[in-house]
């Protein structure tokens, strides 16, 4: 049994050489043809270094799908490899919530956190929902907390009732109503068919 030896994608980020734009020309289909470990490494590089938000968005979608496959155990990787890759994806999603400037990309990562029920990132979603410069990001972070039935952060979500943007306030109102209705329910993540 081999163990995944994957360099820490979050150390020495500033030391990465500037990569050729052709490198970032990888499409979703090309990335999907790579073995899972290599695919994750490439997606991390794209998310951290591409100036094309559509490429970062694609990579987030693929990371979410990969997380889902790893979580289900429907793969040929060892448990150690699978756990390590899931940890890298969670760390990457947390990094995106803190660093992404594009609202559409931020929206997408919030969705994938909720769809995969990555509860360790609830505090990061709260921060995004209350503090992000992106209206779209604040909206989706709050909506994602509602989808995840994050009862434990209702007080923090209430802060968004004072958001200067009507759509964000409406999202907070909606989510708080939903959380009250689902108080005794458990969220298990979206089922991907």
Can you describe what each PLM-predicted range is?
Residues 1-25, 29:
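Intrinsically disordered, serine/threonine- and proline-rich low-complexity regions
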Residues 4-7, 33-47, 69-99, 118-130, ...:
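Amphipathic alpha-helical scaffolding segments comprising HEAT/armadillo-like alpha-solenoid repeats
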Residues 52-54, 102-104, 134-136, 166-167:
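Alpha-helix N-cap/helix-start positions at coil->helix boundaries
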Residues 167-173, 185-187:
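Boundary/linker segments of alpha-helical solenoid repeat arrays
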């Amino acid at each position: 049994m081999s163990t995944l030896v994957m360099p820490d994608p979050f150390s020495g980020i500033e030391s990465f050489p500037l990569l050729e734009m052709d490198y970032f020309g990888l499409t979703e289909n090309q990335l999907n043809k790579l073995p899972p470990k290599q695919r994750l490494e490439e997606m991390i590089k794209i998310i951290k270094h591409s100036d094309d938000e559509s490429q970062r968005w694609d990579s987030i979608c693929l990371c979410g799908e990969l997380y889902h496959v790893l979580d289900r155990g429907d793969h040929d990787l060892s448990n150690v490899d699978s756990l390590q890759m899931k940890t890298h994806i969670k760390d990457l999603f947390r990094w995106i919530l803190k660093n992404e400037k594009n609202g559409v990309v931020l929206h997408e990562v919030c969705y994938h956190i909720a769809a995969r029920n990555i509860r360790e990132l609830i505090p990061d979603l709260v921060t995004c929902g209350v503090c992000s410069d992106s209206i779209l990001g604040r909206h989706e972070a709050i909506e994602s907390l509602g989808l995840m039935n994050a009862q434990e952060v209702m007080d923090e979500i209430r802060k968004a009732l004072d958001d200067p943007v009507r759509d964000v306030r409406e999202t907070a109102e909606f989510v708080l109503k939903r959380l009250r209705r689902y108080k005794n329910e458990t969220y298990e993540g979206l089922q991907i068919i």
